[in-house]
């Protein structure tokens, strides 16, 4: 509740989105994670009283590309979690220009473990994409640009075919986050 999540030292998620948001970040974009515990992190704002998690994205260092797809059966049932990840980096021969792009598509079926009609795991549909690029303008200087787009729909509870206000119990979030910097 009081932990601020940052991407490249910038706040991306609200307190509520932070509960679910970390799940939207593809691992293939992460270079490292910095954790600052306690009140000293409050300089990042009121959401950071308990601490700050700063996710640093990868900077392009060599030409590369990768794609992967994972399908997981949830609890041995007919519910599945599908994730597709894509990333690529292009760097000029003199290392003065570089760009890294990444993306993830996630689709997870709702799962009712005990058959009571209420989901234990929500249905999720999400997409994440972004890039980080640089131009070295001098021996000790560089201009960096980055963009991140996160979009997710999540629905749990019962009667998933009905609008949330008509269900007995409903959990639903639908958000899109866009951020960038130069």
Describe the predicted segments one by one:
Residues 2:
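Exposed beta-strand and adjacent loop surfaces of beta-rich binding modules
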Residues 5:
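Short aromatic-centered micro-motifs
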Residues 8-9, 139:
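Residue-level detection of beta-strand-connecting loop/turn positions
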Residues 10-37:
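Short acidic/polar hinge/loop motifs at secondary-structure boundaries
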Residues 14-16, 29-31, 42-54, 58-114, ...:
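Outer-membrane beta-barrel translocator/receptor signature
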Residues 20, 40-44, 73-77, 118-120, ...:
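Outer-membrane beta-barrel domain signature
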Residues 38, 58, 148-150:
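Residue-level recognition of strand-loop junctions within catalytic nucleotide-signaling folds
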Residues 108-128, 134-136, 140-182:
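Flexible loop and strand-edge segments within Gram-negative outer membrane beta-barrel domains
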